[in-house]
Amino acid sequence: MLRDGNKQSKNNVRFVRKSIKTTVKTSLQNRSSLKKPPVGRSKSRSISSIPSSAVASTLSLPEKVETKCLEEDTQGESSSSGNKDPTTKVLDVTAKPKSKRRKSFTSLLVNGSKFDEKNGETTEPEKLPSIDDESNQLEVAEYVDDIYQFYWTAEALNPALGHYLSAHAEVSPVTRGILINWLIEVHFKFDLMHETLYLTMDLLDRYLSQVPIHKNEMQLIGLTALLLASKYEDYWHPRIKDLISISAESYTREQILGMERSMLKQLKFRLNAPTPYVFMLRFLKAAQSNKKLEQLAFYLIELCLVEYEALKYKPSLLCASAIYVARCTLHMTPVWTSLLNNHTHYNVSQMKDCSDMILRFHKAAKTGNLRVTYEKYINPDRSNVAVLKPLDKLPL
């Protein structure tokens, strides 16, 4: 009986101890749950002396976390926390809700590169109107920038040909001018396209810059260049017998075909060149030109074809300068616009020397010996632009 009573008392003690532990554990859980913020609210807590590895792991979490490092007073915070280290930092970690759209790294770089608008340092580019008609499929507005990027690149890679005749013993700038003046007349008689004329001059000069020739071959090379250009650019090309006839039977069919093969081989079949014509088309659109401005600009650039001096300038600069001189001659204001500056890549100061040269050609056109271009543009179909009085000098 005594043993049974001792066993029962021991069991009662164990039951009481077990119930006490359960009660204490429950109270501790309730106390810790009171410290937790309600679900759905953003939680903020201060963490003292977090190692850099922990911060890196926190930033790599999927949720966006904004971390701010605050320097605390060494006496205030360290005394309360018991930390005596004066370099103690407190990190305020605030959890933010996920954004629907993540920002790309490029957008962050762009935003970081902007100047402060409050300091007035922003340099936002001027919004210029488009010069392309996207509704017109023939203008290939989707590809026009890529096309002209090719022309700009090709022009930069091709050196200027302003001194190539110094290597020729029998060909002079005067001889070249006479040949080109005659080719302009032949081109006009055959009623070929503008593109054909400018490509003819490009093929002629490129070939002469690479191959030494005799004086009696000049006309043969000119006619062959015209034949190649018309095959590449025009709807039709002159027959070889017509070219022989217009040269007063100076050459045979075999000679023309042989020169055609020689030119193609020497030029490596590269016929798509950045001629002044392709730049003129684009720049006139940027100038929002009327017919008179267009005809005068083409008249001035065609005067440059005959002059060997003009070869020292790039085709794009020649076209931009021709439009500038034409606008000044017609007293248009402003003489140069932001749209022209954007599409030509030239400002007025960069065109000064070239513009002065073109104005000199304009003054001499009426009384010069090579008058085919002057007589061509004195026609009413070309707005009689050749009769316009040249300026005494260009505005500063």
UniProtKB/Swiss-Prot annotation:
Alphabetized Pfam families for the sequence: Cyclin_C, Cyclin_N
Region (Disordered): 1-98
Molecular function via GO: cyclin-dependent protein serine/threonine kinase regulator activity
Keyword Cell division: yes
SUPFAM superfamilies reported for this sequence: Cyclin-like (SSF47954)
GO biological process terms, semicolon-separated: cell division; G1/S transition of mitotic cell cycle
Chain intervals with Low complexity compositional bias: 39-57
UniProt cross-references to PANTHER family, sorted A to Z: CYCLINS
Protein name listed in UniProt: Putative cyclin-B3-1
Organism: Arabidopsis thaliana
Lineage: Eukaryota, Viridiplantae, Streptophyta, Embryophyta, Tracheophyta
